[in-house]
Amino acid sequence: MKPHLIFDYDGTIHDTLRIYFPALQKAFRWLREEQGVDVPEVPRHQAASWLGMNTRDMWNSFLPGLPMELKQKAALLAGEAMAEQVRAHRAAWYPGVRDVLDTLKSRGFHMSILSNCQRSYGLIHWEEFGMDRWFDAFYDCETYGHAPKSGIILEIGRT
């Protein structure tokens, strides 16, 4: 039996900055213009450093003094903006990813995704990219109470 391969998604398979950076800019604009929050300018490389963090950790590290209510609303705005971009077919996988996945699948590997994303985000991508062609499952951190990936892998292994 072949091993089961578990891939990260954002920044590994999915060229996330393509939709993440504009979505963050939208949320930052809302905080500045409608909430009067002094949000520092964020270069792309800083936004890229947040890939792999769950939403809560990202906002807590970036604007720790911001009230939770505003963090949640800004995160929701960014998430909605990303979903809109996926539905508008602006999301993209890195070049060559499909070929690699086709090769692995043809060699009998079972594959899954494990991501620090929200459940709704994973579902949108699953549908947009027809991910069932390659993957058995898309595990998101929201479903597991935002547990660390190491804990989620242990949970997955028990099923």
Where are these regions (language model features)?
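Short, acidic loop-to-helix structural element flanking the phosphoryl-transfer center
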Residues: E84-I113, L123, S150
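Substrate-recognition "cap/lid" segment bordering the active-site pocket of phosphatases
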Residues: Q118-T159
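N-terminal helical cap/lid subdomain that shapes the substrate entry/recognition surface
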Residues: K2-P95
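Alpha-helix N-cap/helix-start and coil->helix boundary motif
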Residues: Y20-F21, R56, R98, Q118-S120, ...
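Conserved phosphate-coupling serine/threonine residues in phosphotransfer and NTP-handling enzymes
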Residues: T12, S115-C117
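A general structural motif
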Residues: M1-K2, G108
